[in-house]
């Protein structure tokens, strides 16, 4: 990455806000009661040609918090088995998962001289709701994300590609969707990031 291009492209593109793509996989729809099971965060950068690209992805499997609800329909939808032996070996607590991801985000904020992160997600309010609920549960004091503002790729993809469902938007954009990897936080976050970068790059000339 060209550091000068990166700073110019990221620091000022969104008024000092750093877009970070987040996807969560959960055991339900209620962030106050339902378990957070996976979280992935995709960091973005600007290449030597001035295009927005994926920089790095951080992902964690998460142990359900004590007393968390595990909705069977949600588990069947995602295919996640919370008590699978392999998953139990690699999963971490909500607090550790968030601390690990927030540490990387803070490094990116310093690197790009941005004042705060802004969450990018497909149905972003859902992801931000679970992140904020986990932050409150774990007592983490420094949440790098704006508390309510987001970039939602549902809206962006509806405008750019005429599709609002993630898989259909990815196909419409010509990025290729693999159903076998769907509902993995890592895969969904990276595909969301690819869509976001494509939309931003299409509008680059208007903001250069």
Predicted features, each with a name:
Residues 2-122:
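Conserved non-catalytic scaffold segment of RNase H-like nuclease domains
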Residues 23-25, 127, 152, 188:
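Acidic active-site catalytic centers that drive phospho-/nucleotidyl reactions
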Residues 26-28, 155, 191:
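Short, glycine/acidic-enriched loop or turn micro-motifs at the edges of active sites
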Residues 29-31, 158, 194:
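Conserved protein kinase catalytic core
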Residues 62-78, 82-85, 153-189:
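Active-site-proximal helix-loop-helix substrate-binding element of RNase H-like nuclease domains
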Residues 82-90, 138-144, 177-179:
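Short, polar/flexible loop-turn hinges at active-site or ligand-entry regions and domain interfaces
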Residues 118-125, 129-130, 134-135, 167-208:
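Acidic, Mg2+-coordinating catalytic module of metal-dependent nucleases/exonucleases
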Residues 135-140, 144-159:
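Histidine/lysine/aspartate-rich catalytic loop segments that bind and position anionic ligands
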């Amino acid at each position: 990455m060209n550091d000068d291009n990166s700073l110019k492209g990221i620091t000022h593109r969104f008024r000092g806000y750093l877009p970070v793509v987040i996807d969560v996989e959960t055991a339900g729809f209620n962030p106050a009661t339902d378990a957070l099971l996976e979280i992935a965060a995709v960091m973005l950068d600007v290449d030597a040609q001035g295009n927005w690209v994926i920089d790095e992805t951080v992902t964690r499997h998460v142990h359900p918090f004590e007393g968390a609800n595990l909705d069977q329909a949600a588990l069947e939808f995602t295919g996640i088995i919370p008590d699978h032996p392999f998953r139990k070996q690699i999963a971490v607590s909500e607090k550790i998962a968030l601390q690990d991801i927030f540490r990387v985000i803070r490094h990116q904020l310093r690197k790009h001289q941005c004042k705060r992160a802004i969450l990018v997600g497909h149905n972003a309010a859902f992801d931000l709701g679970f992140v904020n609920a986990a932050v409150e549960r774990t007592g983490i004091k420094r949440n790098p994300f704006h508390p309510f503002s987001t970039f939602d790729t549902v809206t962006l993809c509806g405008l750019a590609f005429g599709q609002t469902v993630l898989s259909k938007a990815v196909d419409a954009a010509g990025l290729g969707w693999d159903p076998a990897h769907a509902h993995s936080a890592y895969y969904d976050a990276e595909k969301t990031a690819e869509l976001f970068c494509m939309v931003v790059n299409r509008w680059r000339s208007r903001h250069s």
